[in-house]
Amino acid sequence: ELVRILMGHKDAEIKWYGSRSYVDQKYADVYRNMFQIVDAKCMDDNMEELADQVDVIFTATPQGLCASLVNEEILSKTKIIDLSADFRLKDVNVYEEWYKIEHKAPQYIDEAVYGLCEINRDLVKSARIVANPGCYTTCSILTAYPLAKEGLIDMSTLIIDAKSGTSGAGRGAKL
């Protein structure tokens, strides 16, 4: 979906289709809906090499991978917009408890900006790391924020009861 959105943006040019699983395979062979739209091959996701070539790197990786790759050299050259949860949570202990993995870049958590533009637009513009919000949180925050901002609800009593199909949060169907 990210590729489709970027391809339709007048100011975006995709330079690199990174993948660890599909290196040297045509992107459209992996993602058939891109047949006759994308003629590029997937390349290894060497972020240090890529940082010299682009203004922004989008990562759409499993939890933990972006945090294990990001470093000061990369961030000195480009911005990162991370679609995983690696920089969404400001408490490393909560992240590690929830995802059952050690956070590999806790030094960047405080500077990462939660990328909900409706609330953090100015911070997103200047951030080196943008933590792309997930679907549940976006829905929940955009629903409650205007009411909370005006003091119309008590946040300590707020309950969000949300449901998902089998593909929610990147999960597949399994028993």
For every predicted segment, state its role.
Residues 1-175:
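N-terminal Rossmann-like NAD(P) cofactor-binding subdomain of oxidoreductases
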